[in-house]
Amino acid sequence: MIQQERLLKVLKAPHVSEKATNNAEKSNTIVFKVALDANKVEIANAVEQLFEVKVDSVRTVVVKGKTKRHGARMGRRSDWKKAYVTLQEGQSLDFVEGAE
């Protein structure tokens, strides 16, 4: 079993975008920003234990950081990892519900 401390470090934040919102409505998929060293099993366990839902599948992608200019200097944003977590039928997780 994964330690509680590690579970809290795996999930960083929900990723809110137009694509993420459409996925949530159509295919019951939630998108999270996760730690770069997190694997699919850790992500699934973290979502199941923290939000008390059943996970069907997890897909991950590493988003490469963009090169940006700061005046005359060139800089680069950090790489980050995104996880698409598909919940089982009948399960739901709504972050926006309490904000209204």
UniProtKB/Swiss-Prot annotation:
Q: Name one GO biological process term.
A: translation
Which parts pass through the membrane? none
Q: Which PROSITE patterns match?
A: RIBOSOMAL_L23
Q: Which GO terms describe its cellular component?
A: ribonucleoprotein complex; ribosome
Q: Which GO terms describe its molecular function?
A: rRNA binding; structural constituent of ribosome
Q: Which UniProt keywords apply?
A: Ribonucleoprotein, Ribosomal protein, RNA-binding, rRNA-binding
Which InterPro entries does the UniProt entry name for this protein? Nucleotide-bd_a/b_plait_sf, Ribosomal_uL23-like, Ribosomal_uL23/eL15/eS24_sf, Ribosomal_uL23_CS
Q: What positions belong to coiled-coil segments? A: none
Q: Which Pfam families match?
A: Ribosomal_L23 (PF00276)
Q: Which domain of life is it from?
A: Bacteria
Function, please?
One of the early assembly proteins it binds 23S rRNA. One of the proteins that surrounds the polypeptide exit tunnel on the outside of the ribosome. Forms the main docking site for trigger factor binding to the ribosome.
Q: Subunit info?
A: Part of the 50S ribosomal subunit. Contacts protein L29, and trigger factor when it is bound to the ribosome.
Q: Which family does it belong to?
A: Belongs to the universal ribosomal protein uL23 family.
Protein name, entry field: Large ribosomal subunit protein uL23
The organism is Pasteurella multocida (strain Pm70)
Instruction: Give me the gene this protein comes from.
Output: rplW
